[in-house]
């Protein structure tokens, strides 16, 4: 997983918003 600030990239739950598998 990578940090992603793009709301469209919010694919995985995590402790911070914007956690993405993109």
From Swiss-Prot:
* Key words of the record: Lyase, Metal-binding, Zinc
Superkingdom to which the source organism belongs: Eukaryota
Required co-factor(s) are: Zn(2+)
Catalytic positions are 12 (proton donor/acceptor)
| EC number(s) stated in the UniProt entry for this protein | 4.4.1.5
Q: Which chemical reaction does it catalyze?
A: (R)-S-lactoylglutathione = methylglyoxal + glutathione
Q: Describe how the cofactor binds.
A: Binds 1 zinc ion per subunit.
Pathway terms, separated by semicolons: Secondary metabolite metabolism; methylglyoxal degradation; (R)-lactate from methylglyoxal: step 1/2
What ranges does the record give for the region Disordered, renumbered to this chain?
1-22
This entry's Gene Ontology molecular function terms read: lactoylglutathione lyase activity; metal ion binding
Report further notes.
On the 2D-gel the determined pI of this protein is: 5.7, its MW is: 35.1 kDa.
Task: Describe the task this protein carries out.
Answer: Catalyzes the conversion of hemimercaptal, formed from methylglyoxal and glutathione, to S-lactoylglutathione.
The similarity comment for this entry is: Belongs to the glyoxalase I family.
* Name of the protein in question: Putative lactoylglutathione lyase
What species is this protein from? Answer: Pinus strobus
């Amino acid at each position: 997983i990578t940090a992603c600030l793009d709301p469209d990239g919010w694919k995985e739950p995590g402790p911070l918003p914007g956690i993405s598998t993109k």
